[in-house]
C-alpha cells in the first residue's frame, strides 16, 4: 500500500494542475477525496471502515484518473438532477481498492441503499435485532429512496426473521434495478445489483 508520506507528495505535485478550473474542478475534488480515503492515515483513524482501502498505481496520477473520469462520468444524469457518487465496492470482490476495474459512478440513492444494507448489528444479520421487551426478533429494512427503515414485523425465531428480510430485500433490489435501467445503466451494473445477497457478518 502507498504510504501517507507519498500521498502528501502527490497532493503537493498536483496543486498547480491545469484541470483545477472549470468542469475539471469536479474531477480534481473527487480525485483528492479518494486519495484521502485510500491513503490518509488521519482519515482512516476517524473512519475505520476505510482502514484496508487502497488505490491503484495509475490513479496516483491525476491525468490517469481524469482520463477514466471523462469516459465514465454520467454528465447526462447530472443534468437531470441525479446526484452521483464514486463507488468502489459494487464491482469489486471485497478488495476495497479504487481502480478503473472496481469503480463506477452510481446515483447516491443506490449507493445509500447498498451501504445501509451492509451495516451489521448484534444479531449478525443486517436489519434483524432481538427485542428484549417482547423476546422476539424484529425486522426492519432500508427501503430504496426512503430515509426511514420499513418495519417488517416481530418473529419468534431468527430463521423466520431472516426469511422475511430476504423477501423484502429482493423487493427493494428489484426497485433499484428498474431505476438503473431507466437511467440506461449497462446490464453488467444491473446484474451486480441483482446478485447482491443479504449481508451476514459471519460470511
What are these regions (language model features)?
Residues 136, 159-169, 194-203:
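C-terminal accessory/regulatory regions appended to core domains
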Residues 51-56, 147-159:
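A short, exposed loop/beta-hairpin motif centered on an aromatic-Gly-Thr core
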Residues 42, 138-147, 153:
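Active-site proximal helix-loop segment of RNase H-like, two-metal nucleases, encompassing DDE(D)
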Residues 65, 128, 139, 155, ...:
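An aromatic-rich alpha-helical recognition segment common to small helix-rich domains
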Residues 21-24, 32, 37-39, 46-141:
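Short, cationic Gly/His-enriched loop motifs
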Residues 110, 118, 172-203:
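Extended, polar beta-sheet/loop recognition surfaces of beta-rich domains
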Amino acid at each position: 500500500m502507498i504510504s501517507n508520506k507519498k500521498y502528501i507528495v502527490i497532493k503537493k505535485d498536483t496543486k498547480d494542475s491545469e484541470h483545477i478550473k472549470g468542469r475539471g474542478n469536479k474531477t480534481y475534488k473527487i480525485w483528492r477525496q479518494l486519495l484521502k480515503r485510500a491513503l490518509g492515515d488521519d482519515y482512516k483513524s476517524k473512519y475505520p471502515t476505510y482502514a484496508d482501502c487502497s488505490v491503484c498505481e495509475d490513479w496516483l496520477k491525476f491525468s490517469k484518473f481524469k482520463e477514466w473520469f471523462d469516459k465514465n462520468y454520467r454528465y447526462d444524469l447530472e443534468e437531470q438532477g441525479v446526484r452521483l457518487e464514486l463507488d468502489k465496492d459494487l464491482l469489486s470482490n471485497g478488495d476495497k481498492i479504487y481502480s478503473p476495474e472496481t469503480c463506477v459512478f452510481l446515483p447516491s440513492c443506490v449507493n445509500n441503499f447498498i451501504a445501509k444494507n451492509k451495516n451489521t448489528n448484534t444479531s449478525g444479520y443486517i436489519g434483524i435485532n432481538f427485542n428484549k421487551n417482547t423476546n422476539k426478533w424484529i425486522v426492519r429494512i432500508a427501503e430504496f429512496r426512503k430515509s426511514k427503515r420499513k418495519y417488517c414485523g416481530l418473529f419468534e425465531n431468527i430463521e423466520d426473521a431472516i426469511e422475511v428480510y430476504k423477501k423484502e430485500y429482493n423487493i427493494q433490489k428489484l426497485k433499484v434495478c428498474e431505476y438503473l435501467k431507466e437511467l440506461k445503466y449497462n446490464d453488467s451494473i444491473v446484474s451486480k445489483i441483482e446478485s447482491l445477497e443479504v449481508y451476514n457478518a459471519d460470511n
